[in-house]
Amino acid sequence: SFYLYYASFFDIALFTVFIIDIIKFYILSGVIFYFFNIDCIMFFWRVFLFITMGFLFFIFTTWYFICFYMYICMFIWNLVIYFRYNLKYCLFFCMLFIIYI
């Protein structure tokens, strides 16, 4: 039963990351389209869009690093709780771990 809860958790996590990817490419494609558009020739708007694109890239990479380290911590935490205390419902302790952080 541990592996069932573990797999369902990571299915939800991967689906969430997939949704974030879709939103990211939708936003960045719009920014790139406007950056190379004929109506957007003024230097100020190109610089503004370039800074905005860099800021969006920074936000998403920061978000990915936070998710990556959180998933690693929850993976280790899940294994420690399961093998140390032999409990079935490890996701509850993952939630406690997130609240603790």
UniProtKB/Swiss-Prot annotation:
Entry keyword annotation includes Membrane: yes
**One Gene Ontology CC term in the entry:** mitochondrial inner membrane
Could you tell me the EC number(s) of this protein? 7.1.1.2
TM ranges are 12-32, 48-68, 79-99
Q: How does it sit in the membrane?
A: Multi-pass membrane protein
Q: Which UniProt keywords apply?
A: Electron transport, Membrane, Mitochondrion, Mitochondrion inner membrane, NAD, Respiratory chain, Translocase, Transmembrane, Transmembrane helix, Transport, Ubiquinone
Indicate where this protein resides in the cell.
Mitochondrion inner membrane
Which GO molecular-function terms appear in the entry?
A: NADH dehydrogenase (ubiquinone) activity
Reading the lineage from the top rank, the first entry is: Eukaryota
Question: Which reactions are catalysed by this chain?
Answer: a ubiquinone + NADH + 5 H(+)(in) = a ubiquinol + NAD(+) + 4 H(+)(out)
Hey, which family's this protein in? Belongs to the complex I subunit 5 family.
Record function comment: Core subunit of the mitochondrial membrane respiratory chain NADH dehydrogenase (Complex I) that is believed to belong to the minimal assembly required for catalysis. Complex I functions in the transfer of electrons from NADH to the respiratory chain. The immediate electron acceptor for the enzyme is believed to be ubiquinone.
Q: What name does the UniProt record give this protein?
A: NADH-ubiquinone oxidoreductase chain 5
What species does this protein belong to? Leishmania tarentolae (Sauroleishmania tarentolae)
Q: Which gene encodes it?
A: ND5
